[in-house]
Amino acid sequence: MEKKATVGFTLLLLGVMMAIIITSMFVLKVEPHIPLVVCLLIAAVFGRYLRVGWNDLESAMIDGLKIGIKPIFILALVGIVIAVWMMSGTVPTLLFYGLSIISPEWFAVSTLLICMIVSSFTGSSFTTVGTIGVAMMGIGTALGIDPAIAAGAVVCGACFGDKMSPLSDTTNFAPGIVGVDLFDHIRHLLWTTVPSFVITVILFLMIGRSQATSTTQDIQAMLTALDSQFTLSVLTLLSPLLVVILAMRRFPTIPVLVVGILTGIITAAFVQGNADVARWFTIIQNGFSMETGNEVIDGIVNRGGLQSMMWSISLVMIALTLGGVIQRIGVIDTLLQSLTRKLSSRGHLIAATATSSIGVNVVTGEQYLSILLPGKTFESFYTKLNVAKKNLSRTLEDAGTLVNPLIPWGVSGAFFASTLGVDVIDYLPFAFFLFLSPFMTILFGYLGIGVGKEQSLANKRG
């Protein structure tokens, strides 16, 4: 008969795991993959101690992986999109015009706002980061902007749409699991989103004016290199435009990315004159490669391909497998139940919900679980304490959706790091919007700002 995991047992396991991960990443300076494998083995040993059968543990690993099949496939496709859009001249064209228009001091805030607009229209941070985000990173590199700052601006802007857009899957998922109307949920999000985003804009404005940048001569040399090696045409922008339009029309992400790849290949053939099928396959697999004569431009355009995403895909697979085992042996349930004790006030309830979402993100690396599990666990307590459930759905978004990109082994974190070429640990200090939002939701919960009672919500619906 299986044993039930106690709070002490749960804290011991999590403590051991976090010690391994933190020591490995910050002291030994190694990649997170093997430390997570070690944690997986330790979790399995703990599971056997609790008398969970090995077959059950294997099934839990498979169940954990099932959650990540779609994100993994998207990771692979985005790697291909990047390579194809380099080959087609799409990113070089955006880079050329971006260097001509955007001044260095306005780069950070411009990137933030551009990515915010695109993600709001598409509802997808992955699509935004993998398309316009890559182009903005290239512009930032050419302008001499710190890559960590550029990545922070891209991630903040991209995650705005993930949180606020009615087209976003998490924006629909969070209110859906707790029975809150979608647009009530979005309106309620404004209480924490507006101040967090305004502060983020101000911080990026301040940072932008203090950045050392490339000289005019350097920029002109890059423009010359781009113009000499690529056919820079508005036709190369049709592919990303089509991707954005299809995403706005709520087409599924995977078919949208496939369309982006196919139209990019067609553009490469007719605009760039690259009709070599064998070279297409090589670029799709290994990434775009060209010597432009400018070292900075070479570093920007020589990237992408399926192979470039294998680091992230393998990390996500290990993390999701670990998350499946952790969930199966009862660690997450025990952790959540321990947080539901002594919930006597609205502030404590919202703080406990946020802490749970962050904890599930850290333990499993999975965004949806960080919304689903705390949502179902705490839902009845919001009714019991007469706190409007739109506070619950808002907290799940602020601490679930937005924290995942801050976890190096999280699905979003691994994807953003691989796509932008900047480690999560490096861009984290500049991901202002992502950590300001959960802070605001906890603070407002205690201060009573932007919250309502369940009874008033019920009357409104009636």
UniProtKB/Swiss-Prot annotation:
Q: Write down any Gene Ontology CC term.
A: plasma membrane
Please verify whether the record's keywords include Transferase: no
Q: Name one GO biological process term.
A: sodium ion transport
What terms describe the molecular function in GO for this protein? antiporter activity
Q: Where is this protein found?
A: Cell membrane
What is its membrane topology? Multi-pass membrane protein
- What keywords are annotated for this sequence in UniProt? Antiport, Cell membrane, Ion transport, Membrane, Sodium, Sodium transport, Transmembrane, Transmembrane helix, Transport
Q: Does the keyword Protein biosynthesis apply?
A: no
All ranges on the Extracellular side of the membrane: 26-31, 92-97, 146-188, 249-250, 327-353, 422-429
Ranges in the topological domain labelled Cytoplasmic: 1-6, 51-71, 119-125, 209-228, 272-306, 374-401, 451-462
Give TM regions: 7-25, 32-50, 72-91, 98-118, 126-145, 189-208, 229-248, 251-271, 307-326, 354-373, 402-421, 430-450
Which NCBIfam families has this protein been placed in? antiport_nhaC (TIGR00931)
Q: Which family does it belong to?
A: Belongs to the NhaC Na(+)/H(+) (TC 2.A.35) antiporter family.
Q: What does this protein do?
A: Na(+)/H(+) antiporter. Involved in pH homeostasis and sodium extrusion.
Q: What is this protein called?
A: Na(+)/H(+) antiporter NhaC
